């Protein structure tokens, strides 16, 4: 199924690209979320009329994400206190939600879906650098310090 992308989508294409995707991906994900329209003559004309508006919206989202990335990078180490054993091993773990809540408490809004922990949840005390993906093109690093709770 051929579709016209209305947004930049990772591993697929940019705004305005006409791509061929499987019908199920288009029907169940791209079309309902408004990320694409079916590629036909009428939709192509409508898209070309709205192209400037969509590009401006995309640029605005990118600028907002860049501003948030600067705020996140400017943060000092975000401290999370958690119960831990004598050797620094946590009782439980620190996951995406915990990191997002700690950064939000520090003053910068962050959703748990934006936090990237490629090695899984944090299970030890110490200092960590956690990657945060705010936009497909914008990433930031959060300095995280996990300490033992008294």
Curated annotation (Swiss-Prot):
Biological process per Gene Ontology, one example term: translation
Keyword annotations of the record: Ribonucleoprotein, Ribosomal protein, RNA-binding, rRNA-binding
Protein name (Swiss-Prot/TrEMBL): Large ribosomal subunit protein bL9
PROSITE patterns, A to Z: RIBOSOMAL_L9 (PS00651)
PANTHER family listed in its UniProt record: 50S RIBOSOMAL PROTEIN L9 (PTHR21368)
Top-rank taxon: Bacteria
Family that this chain belongs to: Belongs to the bacterial ribosomal protein bL9 family.
Biological function: Binds to the 23S rRNA.
């Amino acid at each position: 199924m051929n579709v016209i992308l209305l947004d930049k989508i990772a591993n697929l294409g940019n705004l305005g690209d006409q791509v061929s995707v499987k019908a199920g991906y288009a029907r169940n994900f791209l079309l309902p979320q408004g990320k694409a329209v079916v590629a036909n003559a009428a939709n192509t004309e409508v898209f070309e009329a709205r192209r400037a508006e969509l590009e401006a919206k995309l640029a605005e989202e990118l600028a907002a994400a860049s501003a948030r990335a600067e705020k996140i990078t400017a943060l000092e180490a975000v401290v999370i206190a958690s119960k831990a054993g004598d050797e620094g091993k946590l009782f439980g773990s620190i996951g995406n939600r915990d990191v997002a809540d700690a950064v939000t408490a520090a003053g910068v809004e962050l959703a748990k879906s934006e936090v990237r922990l490629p090695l899984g949840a944090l299970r030890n005390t110490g200092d960590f650098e956690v990657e945060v993906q705010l936009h497909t093109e914008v990433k930031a690093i959060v300095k995280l310090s996990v300490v033992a709770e008294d």
